[in-house]
């Protein structure tokens, strides 16, 4: 049963499902189908083509191939027009029975000649003729272009010649040649299709009559006839067996208030309590007397260095330092704007031979050649005029049978044929009409009892039958089902008080009581002895930085620093405008710190600067060495109270102090957690009888007996609910004094004393904890990428995708099996009634038939596929009907047919003599109620019923008297005393700790207010049976209850003893039996008549009203537990639970307010490339999401007693509403994250372009992306250029050291050498930053390429005596590097422009002995080519040739 809250969830899900509904549904009539623009109704069958057959099944088109029968044994099979399967033209469609074939008729005349067939298809083309001779040469073309254009055309020119000859344009076409001679005639065409068939011949004479057919199938059994009228009423049966025990008595009255229970046994001493927590530090003690002045201490060790002062003013400029060494080459810059076009260079040397040019245009036709040999025959010409008729040729071979012609006109009827032989037996005919009823036959011999038939359909209600003989007494019926509980009776008078029961056994030990309230604070204890000095406290927090000192003198210039390593290549910035001439270069990176100079003189103190903002806390530094102790300073002014320190570890227990006076009683503590269930108590005395078992199935009711005497009153009802707890008993004796308690917490601090004189120097303290970190230093360089974290727990299952598009139609299924035979037809109308037959002898009793109602017909099966089309028989003309043949010989006697349909019921016969009583049959299903019979005479008084079941529990008793006070418990063991806490200011109130085990019992409290009733307790173990109490007075009869549902059958009870016979009822008058009139209105109740004769047994009456409860029966066996009662009223709210486990990390909070403005940054790298081009084609559709991760509402179990409805309990609803609201909030947050990703590891974006679109104001930087979506564990960290939307992936190792990587055995032989493939220490370049998984990056790059339209990458080649691109000596690009793309394509410096890279700086053109660099840039729309994975220089191999590589990030847009 859904609640409305669940339906809200469903609505949410349904709303999202609706999004996925297709929109292509057409409004076609329900169940019809459309194919090729034609509409078919449901169950229509059609053939879209000859060999396919289709059926429309409730809107679905099912098609199947027509399966043809094998015609391999038919030499001249034909396929009729519009059909699929071949048929034998000379096979008659009707079957021939070999034993009586008819005589063959004479052959018909040959039909007239058919029309001439259509011309055959044209023959294949002949082989083409030889080409014609070339035409004459054309006139010369105009002059070619000037020499300046030569380099553009230089596919190949001679190195020795200075210029180049360029062919002119093509001349005009020559004149058309003469037509060629005619070709030879073509080969003979294929044979045309056969002509139409001739008319059919006249039909042959009719064959002889076939022999008689086999006997037809036996007809189906007829339906059962209507039942006869009911017989007359039989005489009354003997008295029925003793009735079942009456239903349970009404609930007893409310019991008297119970006596107070005996005092409980004295409890065991409680376990020792846990060691107490150290007390909170006391307040300062009263000031001590001033001590004598101490000796001056030794000079302390230097203190730790103070925090950095504020930045001083700039010093005067120092003297210029010596120039540092040349720094390493910076990362490659981004491509500059194209320079102005240079002047034409000197003509280069002749290049190597270029590739073969594309095929030229065809030349002008040559002169006509000599005539070629005769060509193959040409295509057939038009048919010539018809020639004269030739002489008849030899008869040709018979042609293939032509296509079947249309049926000829029907020929004249033939003469009647001779009389045929007897035909085959015909198929069984349809059932004839019912014949007239025959005369009744003589009674047959009594047959043996037939087998049990199936149970017929239930007949219509019969008329009353004649009275039967009295039947034998039935077996005692099973107990009837228990009725519904009656309405509450009027409360009976109060019973006499029961005897006081013997005291019960001691119950199990109770669960520990709630902890007592904490006692009030005790009086302050006597002042303790002065404690030994505490260990030194932790260092205080660093104070605010002091005022800035005056500027120091400029220090001497440091020595030049060592050369730093080259930095990682930066991302491409946007292209900047051309700048003005640059300022002098920036100062070099600072060198390592020089030796410490001599300290300058202190400047005078400046004015106090304002305190700087607190820097973020740095990570904790390592423990420094302890400093020398400083001089003892004067005490400073009291600082603000520090934050509470972490609790110290537990100290060693102190000596036991003198016991303090008992404190006043504290406030009540939090209730402890529920204790462990105690061991079960000893078995109690046997309890009272359990509730009666479920009633057995209801037996057939006996004839009603006369009402019995009123039974003795029912048992007193079960005791009422437990009364409220009695008032607390009197206070118990005071317990023995406990052992000495732990020392009290130190008293509150006294007022502060006067400052004493400085004491003697103390021993050096233990080194204090390191102080808090100073303000943060300048940001360090970016660290190396960390190792990948452990794989997180798998995320929740991803949302299921939207429903996919419907699949294509499946292959047509195989041909369906033949459908089931249809349901049997209805029985025909009954014939007229025959005369009454003589009564037959009584049959033997048949064996009882198996029970079972006749099943109804099943629903019709689904539409089968259409069967294959049958062969088309050629229609013959129908002959005249032959004379009837002589009757065939009589067939063999058929086997006995199945039983015919039951004839119509005859008039009721005279009653036959009574047969012997049959064995009792199985209990039939109950028939419909007959008309109510006349009331029977009252039977003899029934035996008194068994004593009724114990009544329901009475009302709750009144509150009991207070119990006696229990004896005082033994004092618990002394707990260990807590360690003395360090003295400090009181900490903030901590959260309540977990409840400790129960302490010893407190003194008796004042009586509390009466609590609300608690929840029902769990059922206790079954007690022993109690003694029977005295009978109470009878209760007033209750109103009859509604009948209850039939329970499962209980065990039969033991038969009760026979009760005393009751007095006979007053006699009634005997009424004459009148005909049954229509039911009149209910009359007033008549007076009791005189005793009549004993009447015949009446029909079964309707169930009477519930009688008054009978006397109590003997106790039944323990019944099963009853169904759970309805839930009680909601109890008071429970105590606060223990603190839950820490929740999961919350979702990231909203972005905080912008921080303060940072310092001006250093000059940034060169800007990114220019604005993006026009938008690319739309990307692939994004994956949908679904809501399968919604939490399913928990399935509520129904109580045994009936369904539990959600709205029955408002608190449940509130909780579930809260749960739904929380789910919806979480869901909307998740959907928001899907729609607007944040680029974090937990919520990665798909590409930087997505981030730019969702968060256009975010800054460029590193973000996480997950192009393949799904689980975010394989997300990768990239740089997002937020101005362009580019996604840039760094290489794993961006810098390849500058050194000699390759020594060639033959340095003069120059060839390209791949760095990763061939060089011994080389490697192919990988991407994704340090610590990333290469497999994850490879997959993500594949998706990134698919979603991008353009990719760019720069590579810087650092060279020493190695040419990278242009060779200065030769002026060509032969020694230029090769690059290998991600799809293993080679990218070159020259050649096809799609596979060539460019350079933005070329400093590696010659061997100068100095380091230079060339910056290569490759930009492509074929994103699969990037990133670059290998590089091959050519100009390497000599010992003085060195190189290094900086690999830039690959950026996708």
Curated annotation (Swiss-Prot):
What family is reported? Answer: Belongs to the fibrillar collagen family.
PROSITE patterns per the UniProt record, alphabetical: NC1_FIB, VWFC_1, VWFC_2
- List where Low complexity composition bias occurs: 162-176, 187-206, 265-284, 307-319, 350-361, 368-418, 463-482, 527-581, 623-664, 685-722, 800-827, 835-883, 890-908, 997-1021, 1070-1081, 1115-1139
Where would you say this protein principally sits, based on its record? secreted
Domain VWFC: residue ranges: 31-89
Q: Report the residues modified as 3-hydroxyproline.
A: 874, 1153, 1168, 1171, 1174
Which residues lie in the propeptide? Answer: 23-151, 1208-1453
Q: Where in the cell is it found?
A: Secreted, Extracellular space, Extracellular matrix
Domain called Fibrillar collagen NC1: residue spans:
1218-1453
**Signal peptide span:** 1-22
Quote the record's domain comment: The C-terminal propeptide, also known as COLFI domain, have crucial roles in tissue growth and repair by controlling both the intracellular assembly of procollagen molecules and the extracellular assembly of collagen fibrils. It binds a calcium ion which is essential for its function.
Membrane-crossing residues?
Answer: none
InterPro entries of this UniProt entry?
Collagen, Collagen_superfamily, Fib_collagen_C, VWF_dom
Q: This chain belongs to which protein, by name?
A: Collagen alpha-1(I) chain
- In which tissues does this protein get expressed? Forms the fibrils of tendon, ligaments and bones. In bones the fibrils are mineralized with calcium hydroxyapatite.
Return the annotated region ranges for Disordered.
98-1203
Residues with the Pyrrolidone carboxylic acid modification: 152
| Keywords per UniProt | Calcium, Collagen, Disulfide bond, Extracellular matrix, Glycoprotein, Hydroxylation, Metal-binding, Pyrrolidone carboxylic acid, Repeat, Secreted, Signal
On assembly, the entry states: Trimers of one alpha 2(I) and two alpha 1(I) chains.
Tell me which Pfam families the record gives: COLFI, Collagen, VWC
GO CC terms in record = collagen type I trimer; collagen-containing extracellular matrix; cytoplasm; extracellular space
Task: Cite the record's Basic and acidic residues compositional bias ranges.
Answer: 106-116, 1082-1096
């Amino acid at each position: 049963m859904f609640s409305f809250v669940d339906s809200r969830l469903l609505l949410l899900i349904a709303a999202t499902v609706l999004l996925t509904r297709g929109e292509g549904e057409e409004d076609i009539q329900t169940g019809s189908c459309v194919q090729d623009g034609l509409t078919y109704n449901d169950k229509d069958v059609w053939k879209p083509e000859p060999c396919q057959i289709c059926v429309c099944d409730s809107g679905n088109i099912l098609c199947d191939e027509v399966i043809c029968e094998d015609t391999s044994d038919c030499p001249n099979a034909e396929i009729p027009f519009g059909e699929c399967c071949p048929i034998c033209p000379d096979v008659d469609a009707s079957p021939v029975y070999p034993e009586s074939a008819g005589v063959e008729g004479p052959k018909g005349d040959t039909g007239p000649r058919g029309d001439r067939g259509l011309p055959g298809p044209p023959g294949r083309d002949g082989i083409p003729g030889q080409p014609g001779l070339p035409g004459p040469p054309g006139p010369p073309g105009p002059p070619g272009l000037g020499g300046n254009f030569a380099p553009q055309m230089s596919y190949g020119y001679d190195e020795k010649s200075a210029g180049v000859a360029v062919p002119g344009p093509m001349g005009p076409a020559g004149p058309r040649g003469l037509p060629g001679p005619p070709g030879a005639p073509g080969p003979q065409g294929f044979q045309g299709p056969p002509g139409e068939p001739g008319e059919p011949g006249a039909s042959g004479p009719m064959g002889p009559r076939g022999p008689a057919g086999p006997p037809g199938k036996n007809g189906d059994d007829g339906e059962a006839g209507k039942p006869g009228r009911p017989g007359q009423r039989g005489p009354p049966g003997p008295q029925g067996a003793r009735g079942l025990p009456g239903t349970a008595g009404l609930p007893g009255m409310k019991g008297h208030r119970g006596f107070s229970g005996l005092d409980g046994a004295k409890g065991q001493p409680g376990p020792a309590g846990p060691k107490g927590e150290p007390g909170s530090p006391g307040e300062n003690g009263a000031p001590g007397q001033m001590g004598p002045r101490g000796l001056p201490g030794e000079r302390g060790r230097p203190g730790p260095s103070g925090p950095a002062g504020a930045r001083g003013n700039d010093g005067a400029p120092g003297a210029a330092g010596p120039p540092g060494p040349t720094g390493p080459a910076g990362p490659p810059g981004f491509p500059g704007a194209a320079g102005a076009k240079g002047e034409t260079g000197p003509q280069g040397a002749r290049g190597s031979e270029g590739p073969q040019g594309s095929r030229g245009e065809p030349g002008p036709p040559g002169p006509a050649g000599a005539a070629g040999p005769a060509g193959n025959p040409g295509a057939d010409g038009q048919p010539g005029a018809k020639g004269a008729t030739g002489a008849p040729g030899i008869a040709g071979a018979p042609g293939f049978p032509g296509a079947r012609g249309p049926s000829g006109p029907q020929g004249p009827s033939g003469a009647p044929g001779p009389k045929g032989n007897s035909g085959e037996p015909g198929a069984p005919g349809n059932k004839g009409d019912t014949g007239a009823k025959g005369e009744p036959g003589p009674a047959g011999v009594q047959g043996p009892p037939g087998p049990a038939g199936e149970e017929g359909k239930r007949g219509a209600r019969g008329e009353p039958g004649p009275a039967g003989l009295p039947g034998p007494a039935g077996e005692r019926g099973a107990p009837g089902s228990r009725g519904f509980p009656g309405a509450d009776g009027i409360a009976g008078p109060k019973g006499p008080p029961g005897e006081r029961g013997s005291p019960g056994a001691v119950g199990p030990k109770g669960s520990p009581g709630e902890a007592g309230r904490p006692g009030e604070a005790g009086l302050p204890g006597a002042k303790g002895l002065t404690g030994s000095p505490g260990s030194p406290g932790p260092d205080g927090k660093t104070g605010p930085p002091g005022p800035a000192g005056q500027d120091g003198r400029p220090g001497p210039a440091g020595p030049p620093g060592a050369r730093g390593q080259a930095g990682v290549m930066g991302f491409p910035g946007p292209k900047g405008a051309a700048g003005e001439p640059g300022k002098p270069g920036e100062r070099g990176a600072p060198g390592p710190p020089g030796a410490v100079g001599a300290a300058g003189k202190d400047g005078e103190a400046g004015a106090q600067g304002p305190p700087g903002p607190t820097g973020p806390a740095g990570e904790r530094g390592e423990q420094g060495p302890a400093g020398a102790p400083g001089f003892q300073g004067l005490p400073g002014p009291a600082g603000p109270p520090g934050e509470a320190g972490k609790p110290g570890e537990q100290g060693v227990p102190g000596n036991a102090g003198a016991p303090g006076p008992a404190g006043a009683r504290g406030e009540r503590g939090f209730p402890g957690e529920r204790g462990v269930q105690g061991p079960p108590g000893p078995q109690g005395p046997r309890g009272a009888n359990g509730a009666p078992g479920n009633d057995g199935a209801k037996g057939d009711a006996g004839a009603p007996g006369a009402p019995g005497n009123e039974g003795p009153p029912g048992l007193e009802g079960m005791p009422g609910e437990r009364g409220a707890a009695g008032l607390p008993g009197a206070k118990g004796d005071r317990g023995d004094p406990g052992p000495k308690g732990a020392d009290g917490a130190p008293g509150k601090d006294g007022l502060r004393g006067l400052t004493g004189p400085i004491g003697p120097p103390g021993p050096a303290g233990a080194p204090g904890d390191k102080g808090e970190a100073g303000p943060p230093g300048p940001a360090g360089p970016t660290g190396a990428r960390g190792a990948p974290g452990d794989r997180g727990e798998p995320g929740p299952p991803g949302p299921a995708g939207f429903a996919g598009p419907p699949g294509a139609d499946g292959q047509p299924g195989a041909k369906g099996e033949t459908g089931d035979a249809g349901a049997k037809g209805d029985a025909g109308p009954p014939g007229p009634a025959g005369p009454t037959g003589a009564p037959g002898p009584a049959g033997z009793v048949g064996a009882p038939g198996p029970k079972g109602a006749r099943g109804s017909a099943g629903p019709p099966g689904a539409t089968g596929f259409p069967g294959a089309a049958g062969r088309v028989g050629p229609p013959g003309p129908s002959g005249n009907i032959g004379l009837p043949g002589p009757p065939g010989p009589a067939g063999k006697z058929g086997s006995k047919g199945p039983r015919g349909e039951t004839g119509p019921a005859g008039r009721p016969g005279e009653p036959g003599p009574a047969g012997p009583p049959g064995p009792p049959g199985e209990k039939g299903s109950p028939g419909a109620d007959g008309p109510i019979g006349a009331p029977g005479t009252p039977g003899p008084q029934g035996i008194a019923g068994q004593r009724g079941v114990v009544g329901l529990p009475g009302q709750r008793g009144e509150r009991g008297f207070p119990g006696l006070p229990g004896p005082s418990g033994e004092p618990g063991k002394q707990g260990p005393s807590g360690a003395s806490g360090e003295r400090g200011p009181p900490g903030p109130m901590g959260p309540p700790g977990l409840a400790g085990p129960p302490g010893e019992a407190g003194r008796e409290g004042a009586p509390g207010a009466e609590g609300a009733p608690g929840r029902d307790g769990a059922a206790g173990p079954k007690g022993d049976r109690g003694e029977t109490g005295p009978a109470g007075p009878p209760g007033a009869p209750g109103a009859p209850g509604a009948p209850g549902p039939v329970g499962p059958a209980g065990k039969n009870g033991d038969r009760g003893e026979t009760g005393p016979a009751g007095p006979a009822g007053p006699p009634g008058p005997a009424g004459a039996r009148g005909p049954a009139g229509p039911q009149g209105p209910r009359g007033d109740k008549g007076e009791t008549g005189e005793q009549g004769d004993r009447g015949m047994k009446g029909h079964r009456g309707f169930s009477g009203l519930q009688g008054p409860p009978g006397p109590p029966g003997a106790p039944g066996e323990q019944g099963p537990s009853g169904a759970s009662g309805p839930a009680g009223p909601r109890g008071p709210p429970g105590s606060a639970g223990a603190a839950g486990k820490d929740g999961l990390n919350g979702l990231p909070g909203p972005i905080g307010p912008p921080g303060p403005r940072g310092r001006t940054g250093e000059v940034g790298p060169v800007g990114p490339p220019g604005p993006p081009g026009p938008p690319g084609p739309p990307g692939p559709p994004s994956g949908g999401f679904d809501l399968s991760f919604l939490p399913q509402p928990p399935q509520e179990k129904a109580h045994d007693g009936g369904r539990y409805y959600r709205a029955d309990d408002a608190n449940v609803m509130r909780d579930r509403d809260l749960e739904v609201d929380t789910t919806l909030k979480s869901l909307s947050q998740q959907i928001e994250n899907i729609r607007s990703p944040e680029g974090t590891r937990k919520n990665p974006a798909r590409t930087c372009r997505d981030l730019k679109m969702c968060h256009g104001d975010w800054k460029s930087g590193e973000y996480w992306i997950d192009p393949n979506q799904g689980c975010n564990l394989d997300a990768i960290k990239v740089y997002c250029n937020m101005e362009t939307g580019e996604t840039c992936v760094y290489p794993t190792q961006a810098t390849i050291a500058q050194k000699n990587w390759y020594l060639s055995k033959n340095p003069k032989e120059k060839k390209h050498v791949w760095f990763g493939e061939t060089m011994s220490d080389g490697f192919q370049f990988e991407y994704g930053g340090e610590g990333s998984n290469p497999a994850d990056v490879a997959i993500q790059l594949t998706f990134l390429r698919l979603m991008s339209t353009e990719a760019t990458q720069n590579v810087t080649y650092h060279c020493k005596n190695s040419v990278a691109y242009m060779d200065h000596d030769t002026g060509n690009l032969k020694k230029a590097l090769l690059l290998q793309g991600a799809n293993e394509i080679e990218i070159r410096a020259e050649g096809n422009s799609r596979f060539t890279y460019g350079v933005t700086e070329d400093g590696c053109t010659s061997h100068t002995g100095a380091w230079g660099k060339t910056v290569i840039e490759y930009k492509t729309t074929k994103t699969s080519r990037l990133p670059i994975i290998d590089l091959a220089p050519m100009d390497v191999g000599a010992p003085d040739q060195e190189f290094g590589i900086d690999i830039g990030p690959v950026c996708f847009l």
